[in-house]
Curated annotation (Swiss-Prot):
Region (Linker): 230-250
Cofactor(s) named in the record: Mg(2+)
Subunit architecture: Homotrimer.
Domain of life: Bacteria
Subcellular location: Cytoplasm
GO cellular component, one term: cytoplasm
Protein function: Catalyzes the last two sequential reactions in the de novo biosynthetic pathway for UDP-N-acetylglucosamine (UDP-GlcNAc). The C-terminal domain catalyzes the transfer of acetyl group from acetyl coenzyme A to glucosamine-1-phosphate (GlcN-1-P) to produce N-acetylglucosamine-1-phosphate (GlcNAc-1-P), which is converted into UDP-GlcNAc by the transfer of uridine 5-monophosphate (from uridine 5-triphosphate), a reaction catalyzed by the N-terminal domain.
Region described as Pyrophosphorylase: spans on this chain: 1-229
HAMAP family reported for this sequence: GlmU
Annotated cofactor note: Binds 1 Mg(2+) ion per subunit.
Name listed for the protein in its UniProt record: Bifunctional protein GlmU
Amino acid sequence: MSNRPMSVVILAAGKGTRMYSDLPKVLHLLAGKPMVQHVIDAARELNAQRVNLVYGHGGELLKTALDDRSLNWVLQAEQLGTGHAMQQAAPYFADDEDILMLYGDVPLITGETLRRLQAVKPDGGIGLLTVNLANPTGYGRIIRENGRVVGIIEQKDAAPEQLAIGEINTGILLAGGADLKRWLSKLTNNNAQGEYYITDIIALAHQEGRQIEAVHPVRTTETDGVNNRLQLATLERVYQAEQAEKLLLSGVMLQDPARFDLRGTLEHGRDVVIDTNVIIEGHVKLGNRVKIGSGCVIKNSVIADDCIISPYSVIEDAQLAPDCSVGPFARLRPGSELAEGAHVGNFVEMKKARLGKGSKAGHLSYLGDAEIGANVNIGAGTITCNYDGVNKSKTIIGDDVFVGSDTQLIAPVSVAAGVTIAAGTTIMRNVPAAGLVYNRKEQQLNASWQRPQKKK
């Protein structure tokens, strides 16, 4: 096992022609984040002292999307093979460190597998990640003599007997910095593709009498690459199945694991139940006995014990105290807070608003830039009119206020505790004390009026 410091090279220069996209291939999303970010995250599990990202097509898009100052950006102006890509990064290799080579379009690689690779790398030699495939077509074959790895032959350069070999090269390897620089300087492009293959360093190492040790990944799918959208969609389902399995084994009840997407991280308590077609994004924390209904989307939110989220609700950057209920068809936008026992019903939207303990907004309301006290009833059709075309203003509603249906509150405005607002009222000024507030005109009846008739 190598105990030397380590740096990483991630190859991410490919255009991804078969994606039929203007976006660089490695920026296409898997589980809500770019494929290459998954690889960076895995590399960082090994405490790499430097992560070199070799880029080419769409470099500015990459730099903008990743926005990571700790990355060392290495330009590969021409894509002349994996060996050529590593040659561009070689000036950054320290002689006394190990270099781990990864790929930006192999997103399921894990820190666990990479530590396994570290464990087998011999001093002065190469650690190589390989897998056995029933159908190895298209992959470089591992050449062994007396059981020891001596080389890799690419598909287009292989003889018929070599094509029958089932052990293939994943492209992921670990080698010493000084050795790797020396081997890279000896690469040629004398092959069917006219490219510089990184795989040729295996034969060079063997010629020097260096030991090459191969190891398999924890899961074969970790080394699957993405060249088209079908492969990306396939790996998405592989990833989601793995996440669902982990959650089920940790006590979360997923009603249908095949219809659940985790695009981030999920912390959870005991006896959490999640129905079908739920999407979790960013970092979400669910307390004990939380129930999430079908079709909900929850992002970067904390939902405390005993909350019930009914179907088709969308919750983003929100905080829910215990015993709250939301939905169905509710939307909690960033900055929404529900105190203990609060209820937000169907077709209610909140944004930068706090609903106090035991307060209820049952249906068909918009509550934006609002501070609402405890035990408040928000009637159907209530709107906090918070925007004048330029500025956002705040509405403050005290404890025990009853807001009748079809009420508009023109912010900035405050309503004192205990006020009752009659249905159909427009609140334009502060209400300073408890009582009934209303501003509608007397009801009129025109008995002679006749409804218009359609012409026949």
